[in-house]
């Protein structure tokens, strides 16, 4: 699975990718501008989006993803409930909080079942 992961904390993103997403091809981007560029130039099966990033809020990117690819699965991965709620309100398909990444494969599998 080709995953676009919007996360501005590089050490955390590396750890999550290594520990929980190693079976996937993951493109980690630290900002909205980098996420927009990656989405425009690549094809992704899934987006993971944090809420607070250096150049804005992830809900803006989620709305853009929804407008561009309405069926693209998007998982909200903020460490704050309010951030996850904003991401879901913007169109995220599911939530997997930062401290719950041990559940990420279950969340991905659930989204894949819903798409079939």
Predicted region positions:
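Acidic, metal-coordinating helix/loop segments flanking the phosphotransfer/catalytic sites
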Residues: 28-46
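Conserved phosphotransfer cores of two-component systems
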Residues: 40-42, 64-71, 90
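Alpha4 helix (beta4-alpha4-beta5 surface) of REC/receiver domains from two-component response regulators
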Residues: 60, 79-97, 102
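Alpha-helical interaction/dimerization surfaces of two-component signaling modules
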Residues: 16-20, 38, 90
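C-terminal output helix
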Residues: 99-112
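Conserved phosphotransfer microenvironments
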Residues: 45-65, 81
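Hydrophobic/aromatic residues positioned on beta-strands within the core alpha/beta folds
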Residues: 75-77
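Conserved acidic segment of CheY-like receiver
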Residues: 1-11, 16-17, 47
């Amino acid at each position: 699975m080709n995953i676009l992961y919007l996360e501005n904390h590089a050490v955390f993103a590396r750890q999550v990718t290594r520990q929980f997403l190693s079976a996937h091809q993951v493109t980690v981007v630290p900002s909205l501008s980098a996420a927009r560029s990656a989405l425009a130039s690549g094809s992704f099966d899934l987006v993971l989006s944090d809420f607070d990033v250096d150049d804005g809020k992830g809900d803006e990117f989620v709305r853009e993803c929804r407008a561009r690819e309405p069926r693209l699965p998007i998982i909200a991965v903020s460490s704050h409930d309010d951030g996850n709620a904003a991401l879901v309100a913007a169109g995220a398909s599911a939530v997997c909080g930062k401290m719950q990444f041990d559940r990420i494969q279950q969340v991905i599998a659930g989204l894949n079942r819903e798409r079939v």
